[in-house]
């Protein structure tokens, strides 16, 4: 458990929070919860491993895992050795789990509540990727997700996390989220708008989160949120579901934003109450059916979640005036696609018909078929994953493709022990005894793919991308 930090709570914030605090909750408990260290939590990445198999894998570790009630894959975690970063664990490096705050698992759980099975999803404010990867896992890498991030620097982090988790059904965009209603009207059957906010709920993680807080800043942020939710609603197809969420507590950024949408669009939209989302949800349920999570309720961050249903079309927004430019990819023929799939299978890689091959010069990419209809409607930073580069003598398979597409029973797999796996993540060449029998192999640890490598004599040449190389001590439970 992290050491307590002195959390700054502005007097005006405390006064505003006191005014909206439910009668069955106490301000003293709220302030005490804000001053306590935040419990660490993780979410098992079921694209890589089942929850049952994960629990079996780590059962001998000095980890105490407590299930998170609203996410079947989520657990609070306490470890015997807190000195080693959880992010340095072998299971994190290989994508078996994502370090994610418990409350932030709520919006995606709400999006997929009941029998909801969307095929095309928009994540309006996606970085760093916790919710995008959670969505991808619940979709089992099928369908398609447009993951948008306005901050250029955070797009790289978003891609890194998607790649580590073996996600293949995502397209990345880099826009102000207010463009989607005009650019892609009625194009998604589910939308997550985890809106930028004043961050009142995250003080346990960031003691200085409120240092720039003011009533004026809340008003300015709420203005943006109103525009974002309106745009997202236009991008939602009739019959579709949208979740609006924030990690803040005030009504101006939460209830008032949703109620404003209801007032604008009348019977085109309705609230779907979340009181039955999980056992104990009613402790945070508002009269309208939203979840308003104060940190003392579940000993978590503060959060707000609303689930909305669109019932029919609304008048469209003006079409955007931007120019897209020429799309640089072309779809591959059936013959070319079959040849590449055969070569990939020989190297231990495979995919299904929900992905299709496109080319840009010598690059071969694997696009989610569900998102092909959006090509030439909006500019993408990247779609799907880069599968290979084509050369005269064959193909050079790419790291992200190996992580997402390696088959479990491939003959080219070469299992490393803990010592060699750490060397791999440190970016060093390996000298296993005996060496692999094939010139090219997919190196694995705990049966999970770590990357692709070439055998040169008795040496395995390390091809781990430089940005993934780790320095320092790693936690491999030898």
Curated annotation (Swiss-Prot):
<dbReference type="InterPro" id="IPR027391">
    <property type="entry name" value="Nol1_Nop2_Fmu_2"/>
</dbReference>
<dbReference type="GO" id="GO:0009383">
    <property type="term" value="F:rRNA (cytosine-C5-)-methyltransferase activity"/>
</dbReference>
<comment type="function">
    <text>Specifically methylates the cytosine at position 1407 (m5C1407) of 16S rRNA.</text>
</comment>
<feature type="binding site">
    <location>
        <position position="149"/>
    </location>
    <ligand>
        <name>S-adenosyl-L-methionine</name>
    </ligand>
</feature>
<dbReference type="GO" id="GO:0003723">
    <property type="term" value="F:RNA binding"/>
</dbReference>
<dbReference type="InterPro" id="IPR031341">
    <property type="entry name" value="Methyltr_RsmF_N"/>
</dbReference>
<dbReference type="InterPro" id="IPR011023">
    <property type="entry name" value="Nop2p"/>
</dbReference>
<dbReference type="InterPro" id="IPR049560">
    <property type="entry name" value="MeTrfase_RsmB-F_NOP2_cat"/>
</dbReference>
<dbReference type="InterPro" id="IPR001678">
    <property type="entry name" value="MeTrfase_RsmB-F_NOP2_dom"/>
</dbReference>
<keyword id="KW-0489">Methyltransferase</keyword>
<protein>
    <recommendedName>
        <fullName>Ribosomal RNA small subunit methyltransferase F</fullName>
        <ecNumber>2.1.1.178</ecNumber>
    </recommendedName>
</protein>
<dbReference type="InterPro" id="IPR018314">
    <property type="entry name" value="RsmB/NOL1/NOP2-like_CS"/>
</dbReference>
<feature type="binding site">
    <location>
        <position position="176"/>
    </location>
    <ligand>
        <name>S-adenosyl-L-methionine</name>
    </ligand>
</feature>
<dbReference type="Pfam" id="PF01189">
    <property type="entry name" value="Methyltr_RsmB-F"/>
</dbReference>
<keyword id="KW-0698">rRNA processing</keyword>
<dbReference type="InterPro" id="IPR029063">
    <property type="entry name" value="SAM-dependent_MTases_sf"/>
</dbReference>
<keyword id="KW-0808">Transferase</keyword>
<feature type="active site" description="Nucleophile">
    <location>
        <position position="247"/>
    </location>
</feature>
<dbReference type="Pfam" id="PF17125">
    <property type="entry name" value="Methyltr_RsmF_N"/>
</dbReference>
<dbReference type="Pfam" id="PF21150">
    <property type="entry name" value="YebU_pre-PUA_dom"/>
</dbReference>
<dbReference type="InterPro" id="IPR023267">
    <property type="entry name" value="RCMT"/>
</dbReference>
<feature type="binding site">
    <location>
        <begin position="125"/>
        <end position="131"/>
    </location>
    <ligand>
        <name>S-adenosyl-L-methionine</name>
    </ligand>
</feature>
<dbReference type="InterPro" id="IPR048457">
    <property type="entry name" value="YebU_pre-PUA_dom"/>
</dbReference>
<dbReference type="GO" id="GO:0070475">
    <property type="term" value="P:rRNA base methylation"/>
</dbReference>
<keyword id="KW-0963">Cytoplasm</keyword>
<dbReference type="Pfam" id="PF13636">
    <property type="entry name" value="Methyltranf_PUA"/>
</dbReference>
<dbReference type="InterPro" id="IPR023545">
    <property type="entry name" value="rRNA_ssu_MeTfrase_F"/>
</dbReference>
<dbReference type="GO" id="GO:0005737">
    <property type="term" value="C:cytoplasm"/>
</dbReference>
<keyword id="KW-0949">S-adenosyl-L-methionine</keyword>
<feature type="binding site">
    <location>
        <position position="194"/>
    </location>
    <ligand>
        <name>S-adenosyl-L-methionine</name>
    </ligand>
</feature>
<comment type="similarity">
    <text>Belongs to the class I-like SAM-binding methyltransferase superfamily. RsmB/NOP family.</text>
</comment>
<keyword id="KW-0694">RNA-binding</keyword>
């Amino acid at each position: 458990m992290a050491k307590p930090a002195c959390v700054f709570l502005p007097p005006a914030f405390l006064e505003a929070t006191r005014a909206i605090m439910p009668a069955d909750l106490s301000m003293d408990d709220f302030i005490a919860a804000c001053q306590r260290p935040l419990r660490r939590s993780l979410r098992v990445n079921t694209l890589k491993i089942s929850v049952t198999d994960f629990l079996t894998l780590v059962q001998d570790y000095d980890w105490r895992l407590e299930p998170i009630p609203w996410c079947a894959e989520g657990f609070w975690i306490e470890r015997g050795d807190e000195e080693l970063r959880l992010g340095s664990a072998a299971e994190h490096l290989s994508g078996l789990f994502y370090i994610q705050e418990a409350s932030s698992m709520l919006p995606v759980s709400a999006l997929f509540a009941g029998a909801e099975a969307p095929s095309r999803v928009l994540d309006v404010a996606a970085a760093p990727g916790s919710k995008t990867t959670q969505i991808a896992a619940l979709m089992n890498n099928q369908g398609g997700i447009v993951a948008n991030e306005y901050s250029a620097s955070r797009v790289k982090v978003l891609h890194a996390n998607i790649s580590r988790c073996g996600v293949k059904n995502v397209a990345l965009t880099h826009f102000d989220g207010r463009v989607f209603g005009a650019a892609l009207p009625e194009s998604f059957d589910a939308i997550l708008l985890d809106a930028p906010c004043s961050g009142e709920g995250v003080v346990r993680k960031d003691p200085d989160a409120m240092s720039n807080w003011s009533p004026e800043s809340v008003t300015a942020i709420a203005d943006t949120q109103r525009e974002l939710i309106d745009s997202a609603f236009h991008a939602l197809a009739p019959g579709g579901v949208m979740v609006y969420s924030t990690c803040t507590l005030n009504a101006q950024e939460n209830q008032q934003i949703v109620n404003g949408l209801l007032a604008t669009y009348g019977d085109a939209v309705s609230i779907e109450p979340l009181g039955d989302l999980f056992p104990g949800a009613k402790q945070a349920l508002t009269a309208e059916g939203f979840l308003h999570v104060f940190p003392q309720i579940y000993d978590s961050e503060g959060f707000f979640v609303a689930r909305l249903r669109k019932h029919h079309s609304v008048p469209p927004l003006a079409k955007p005036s931007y120019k897209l430019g020429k799309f640089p990819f072309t779809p591959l023929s059936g013959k070319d696609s079959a040849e590449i799939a055969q070569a990939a299978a020989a190297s231990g890689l495979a995919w299904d018909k929900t992905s299709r091959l496109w080319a840009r010069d010598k690059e071969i990419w694997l696009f989610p078929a569900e998102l092909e209809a959006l090509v030439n409607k909006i500019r993408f930073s990247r779609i799907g994953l880069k599968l290979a580069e084509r050369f005269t003598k064959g193909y050079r398979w790419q790291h992200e493709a190996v992580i997402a597409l390696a088959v479990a029973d491939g003959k080219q797999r070469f299992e490393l022990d803990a010592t060699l796996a750490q060397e791999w993540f440190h970016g060093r060449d390996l000298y296993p005894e005996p060496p692999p029998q094939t010139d090219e192999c997919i190196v694995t640890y705990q049966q999970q793919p770590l990357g692709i490598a070439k055998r040169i004599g008795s040496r395995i040449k390390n091809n781990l991308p430089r940005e993934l190389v780790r320095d320092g001590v790693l936690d491999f439970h030898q």
